[in-house]
C-alpha cells in the first residue's frame, strides 16, 4: 500500500526575533540545492563568471570533491567526541567538523526516537515511538517526526539518530522495544518512514537504525545473529527497505553486533549487496558508537562514516589487545599503501555530501531559537491519545463519568508527580524539567560483557501527573492518592472507593533487557490486592513493551498507555473519562508467557571477547503474530488488537484483482459504527500466499483508519500494489536472488486484529 507524503502541518519557527547561540561556519552563504547560483562580487577589472552551483545533489557532491584535498575528504568520514566541538551544544552525540573554505557546514548529531535526546536541552518529551506506531495513523506519525525535526533544528542539530526499525517480535524483552515501531515490517516501516519524513522536511538528515538484527541489548556488541537469506529479506531487512523507500532518508546506522559471523559495520553483503545494491540506498552508512572493528575492511565493506569510540578510520585507537600493538592501519595509510582505492574514499565522501544536500543541510543557516513548547506539547498529547490501547473494558467500566460525585482511588507508580519515560540514548530531558528522577533499575543481565551499561541513564518522570489531571477532569469526585508501597493500605483505600485506578509501570532502557515479561517490584501483587478489594479496578500501564498480566481476569479495565510523554497525565485522564475515545491498536503481540517465545531464555555471552550466537533461524521470517499463527499459539493480546468505547462492523468485502492479478488487487468493504459514541476503527487487510512455498499463514498488506459518528457507515477501498516497497505479493527467492510472485491462489482477509479476520475473497495468479 503506497501512500503519499502528508502536508507539512506547521511552519518552521522564524528566528528574526532571536539571537543565534551558535553558527555553522559560513553556512548562511551556501548556494541552494534547488538551483541558486553564487553571486559574483563587482570588480573594476574583468573577472571570470562564477560557475553555477549544480542543481543535482550528485553533481554538486562531485563538484565539491573535485576541489577537496585528501585530508579534507578524510575529515568528513570520521566523527569526533561531542565535547571537542567548538560550536553548538556540548551534549550532542558527536560531530563532524565542516570545511568552511568550501562552505560545508559542521554536522552535529543527536538522538531522538521520542524527542531530542542526549540532554541537548529541555525538549518536548513525546510518547514512546511504539505508542506512535500504535496509532496506525500516518498523519499522526508525520506530525510526531515533525516535532523532532523542528526541535533538533532549533538546537542547531542537523543529523537525527532516531528511526529505530528493528523488529520487536524477535525478542519482546529487548530493553529498546519502546524505541521501535513494532513487529511487522510493513507497519513498522510505514510508520517509521513518516517519522523520518517529518524530521527531514525540517532540513535535518534523518537516519534509520540499527542495521541489522540488533534485537537484544544483552551482549549486543558480541551477539552473532544467525539468519538465512530468505528470512532476512522478508523480515527485518524488509522493514528497513520500506522505511528508506518511503522517506528518502539519507543515513543508515549500522549496529555493533554480528550477522552470520561478520560485524554489521564491515558486512559487505548487508551493506553493499543488500542496502546499497538491491535496495538502492544512495545515502551514507554511519557506524553506531563503539561499533567499528577495523579500518579498511569496514570501508571496503560499505561503512561511509565512523563515529566516536571506534577511531579506526583515523588511526588513533586501533589497539589490539591480543599482543599490545597498534595494529590496524588508518585510511590515510591504506590509501598510500594501495590497500584501499581512492575511488572508495570518493564514494564515501560523495554519499555524505549528497545526504547533506538532499536534506537541505548544505543550504540551511543555523537558526538557534526556543522551541515552540506549547504547540509541540499539544502534538505530544494528541500522539498519546491516538496511540493508547484499551485492552479490557468489562461491563463498560470505562469511560468514567466526569460529572459523578464519586470516590476515586489513584494508586501507584508516582502518579502524583508524573509519568514514566524510557532510558538510554532515547532519554529526553523534558521541557519544564523532570518531575522525579530515580536511579536506574538495572537487572542482572545488564552486567553481561559486550553490552552497553544501563547505569548511565536515570528513571525520569515527565511533568504531567495523572492525579492532578483526574482531579481537574472530575471536579465533583473525591480523589485520594496512595503510593502503592503497602498493598494492604492500597487495598483498604480501594475498598472504600467507587473505583480504583492502579498505575503499573516498568522502566526499560538501552543497555539492558528485561529478565522476563512481568512487572517488577511486586506490582502484580499490588494490583491483585486492590482488585480483590474492589471489583471496579482499572489498571493503567506505563511500560515499553509486552507484559504478562496474572491479575487480568480480576480487573474491570486495562489501558495500555506506553510511555505517554510530556502531556501523558492529561491524555490518560481524557481517555479514562471519555473526552477521547481510545482508538489505538497493538503494533506488537503480547505473549501469554515466556514459554511461547522462540527463545524462552535470552542468549547470553560467555566471554568478554568472543562472539555468541543468537539463533534467529528458529522463527525465521515468522516474527511476532506470524510466529503465533504458525505455531498455533494463543497470545495474551494479538497484534492489531484494541478496543473502543463504541463498536464497529466490517461487512460486504469484495476483492478485485488487477489485470494481470500478479500486479495486485483492491479490497472494498463497509465499516459501520454500531455503537452510540463517535470513534475510529482500524480495518486491517491481510494476505495469504499460495500454499507450498513455505510462507506464513498471512501477512499484513494494508489498513485504513476510519473515524465514524454513531450509526455512520463508510465504504473503504484498500489498494495493494505488488510493486510497492513492501513486496506484498512476493516471497524472496534464493534461486533467482530476487522477489517472486508465485503462481497459485491468494486469499485476502479483512478484520480488526490478526486473530479476528475473515476471508474476503481469493484470486488466482496463473
Task: Give a label for each model feature.
Residues 1-16:
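N-terminal secretory signal peptides that target proteins for export/translocation
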Residues 14-25:
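Sec-dependent N-terminal signal peptides
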Residues 30-32:
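C-terminal motif of bacterial Sec signal peptides marking the signal peptidase cleavage site
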Residues 34-36:
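Bacterial signal peptide processing site
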Residues 40-734, 738-740, 745-754:
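Glycoside hydrolase catalytic-domain context in secreted enzymes
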Residues 756-766:
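Short beta-strand elements
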Amino acid at each position: 500500500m503506497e501512500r503519499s507524503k502528508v502536508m507539512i502541518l506547521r511552519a518552521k519557527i522564524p528566528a528574526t526575533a532571536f539571537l543565534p547561540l551558535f553558527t555553522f561556519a559560513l553556512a548562511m552563504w551556501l548556494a541552494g540545492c534547488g538551483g541558486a547560483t553564487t553571486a559574483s562580487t563587482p570588480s573594476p577589472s574583468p573577472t571570470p563568471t562564477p560557475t553555477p552551483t549544480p542543481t543535482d545533489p550528485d553533481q554538486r557532491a562531485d563538484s565539491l570533491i573535485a576541489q577537496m584535498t585528501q585530508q579534507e575528504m578524510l575529515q568528513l568520514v570520521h566523527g569526533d567526541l561531542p565535547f571537542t566541538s567548538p560550536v553548538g551544544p556540548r551534549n550532542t552525540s558527536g560531530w563532524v567538523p565542516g570545511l568552511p573554505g568550501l562552505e560545508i557546514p559542521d554536522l552535529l548529531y543527536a538522538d531522538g526516537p521520542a524527542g531530542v535526546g542526549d540532554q541537548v536541552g529541555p525538549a518536548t518529551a513525546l510518547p514512546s515511538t511504539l505508542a506512535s506506531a500504535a496509532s496506525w495513523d500516518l498523519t499522526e506519525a508525520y506530525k510526531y517526526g515533525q516535532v523532532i525535526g523542528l526541535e533538533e533544528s532549533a538546537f542547531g542539530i542537523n543529523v537525527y539518530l532516531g528511526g529505530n526499525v528493528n523488529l520487536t517480535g524477535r525478542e519482546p524483552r529487548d530493553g529498546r522495544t519502546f524505541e521501535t515501531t513494532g513487529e511487522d515490517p510493513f507497519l513498522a516501516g510505514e510508520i517509521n518512514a513518516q517519522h523520518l519524513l517529518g524530521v527531514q522536511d525540517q532540513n535535518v538528515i534523518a537516519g534509520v537504525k540499527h542495521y541489522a538484527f540488533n534485537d537484544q541489548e544483552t551482549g549486543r556488541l558480541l551477539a552473532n545473529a544467525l539468519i538465512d537469506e530468505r528470512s532476512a529479506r522478508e523480515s527485518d531487512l524488509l522493514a528497513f527497505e520500506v522505511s528508506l523507500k518511503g522517506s528518502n532518508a539519507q543515513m543508515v546506522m549500522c549496529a555493533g553486533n554480528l550477522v552470520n559471523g561478520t560485524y554489521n559495520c564491515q558486512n559487505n553483503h548487508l551493506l553493499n549487496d543488500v542496502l546499497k545494491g538491491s535496495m538502492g540506498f544512495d545515502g551514507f552508512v554511519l557506524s553506531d558508537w563503539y561499533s567499528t572493528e577495523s579500518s579498511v575492511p569496514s570501508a571496503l565493506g560499505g561503512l561511509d562514516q565512523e563515529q566516536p569510540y571506534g577511531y579506526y578510520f583515523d588511526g588513533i585507537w586501533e589497539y589490539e589487545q591480543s599482543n599490545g600493538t597498534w595494529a590496524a592501519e588508518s585510511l590515510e595509510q591504506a590509501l598510500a599503501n594501495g590497500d584501499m582505492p581512492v575511488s572508495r574514499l570518493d564514494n564515501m565522501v560523495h554519499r555524505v555530501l549528497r545526504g547533506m544536500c538532499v536534506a537541505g543541510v548544505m543550504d540551511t543557516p543555523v537558526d538557534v531559537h526556543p522551541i515552540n513548547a506549547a504547540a509541540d506539547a499539544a502534538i505530544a498529547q494528541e500522539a498519546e491519545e491516538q496511540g493508547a490501547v484499551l485492552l479490557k473494558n468489562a461491563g463498560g467500566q470505562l469511560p468514567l463519568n466526569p460529572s459523578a460525585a464519586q470516590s476515586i482511588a489513584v494508586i501507584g507508580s508516582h502518579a502524583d508527580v508524573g509519568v514514566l519515560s524510557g532510558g538510554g540514548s532515547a532519554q529526553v530531558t523534558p521541557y519544564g524539567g523532570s518531575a522525579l528522577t530515580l536511579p536506574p533499575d538495572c537487572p542482572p543481565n545488564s552486567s553481561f560483557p559486550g553490552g552497553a551499561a544501563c547505569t548511565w541513564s536515570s528513571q525520569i518522570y515527565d511533568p504531567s501527573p495523572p492525579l492532578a489531571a483526574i482531579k481537574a477532569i472530575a471536579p465533583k469526585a473525591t480523589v485520594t492518592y496512595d503510593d502503592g508501597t503497602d498493598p494492604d493500605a492500597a487495598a483498604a483505600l480501594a475498598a472504600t472507593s467507587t473505583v480504583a485506578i492502579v498505575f503499573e509501570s516498568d522502566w526499560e532502557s538501552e543497555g539492558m533487557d528485561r529478565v522476563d515479561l512481568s512487572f517488577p517490584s511486586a506490582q502484580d501483587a499490588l494490583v491483585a490486592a486492590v482488585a480483590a478489594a474492589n471489583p471496579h479496578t482499572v489498571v493503567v500501564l506505563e511500560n515499553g513493551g509486552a507484559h504478562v498480566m496474572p491479575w487480568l481476569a480480576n480487573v474491570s479495565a486495562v489501558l495500555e498507555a506506553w510511555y505517554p510523554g510530556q502531556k501523558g497525565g492529561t491524555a490518560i485522564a481524557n481517555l479514562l473519562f471519555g473526552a477521547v475515545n481510545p482508538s489505538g491498536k497493538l503494533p506488537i503481540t503480547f505473549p501469554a508467557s515466556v514459554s511461547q517465545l522462540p527463545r524462552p531464555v535470552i542468549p547470553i555471552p560467555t566471554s568478554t571477547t568472543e562472539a555468541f550466537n543468537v539463533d534467529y533461524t528458529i522463527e525465521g521470517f515468522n516474527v511476532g503474530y506470524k510466529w503465533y499463527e504458525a505455531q498455533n499459539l494463543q497470545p495474551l493480546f494479538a497484534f492489531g488488537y484494541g478496543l473502543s468505547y463504541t463498536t464497529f462492523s466490517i461487512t460486504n468485502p469484495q476483492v478485485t484483482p488487477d489485470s494481470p492479478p500478479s500486479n495486485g488487487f483492491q479490497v472494498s468493504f463497509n465499516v459501520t459504527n454500531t455503537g452510540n459514541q463517535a470513534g475510529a476503527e482500524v480495518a486491517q487487510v491481510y494476505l495469504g500466499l499460495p500454499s507450498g512455498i513455505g510462507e506464513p499463514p498471512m501477512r499484513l498488506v494494508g489498513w485504513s483508519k476510519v473515524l465514524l459518528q454513531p450509526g455512520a457507515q463508510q465504504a473503504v477501498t484498500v489498494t495493494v500494489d505488488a510493486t510497492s516497497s513492501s513486496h506484498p505479493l512476493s516471497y524472496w527467492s534464493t534461486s533467482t536472488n530476487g522477489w517472486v510472485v508465485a503462481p497459485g491462489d491468494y486469499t485476502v482477509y479483512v478484520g480488526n486484529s490478526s486473530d479476528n479476520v475473515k476471508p474476503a475473497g481469493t484470486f488466482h495468479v496463473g
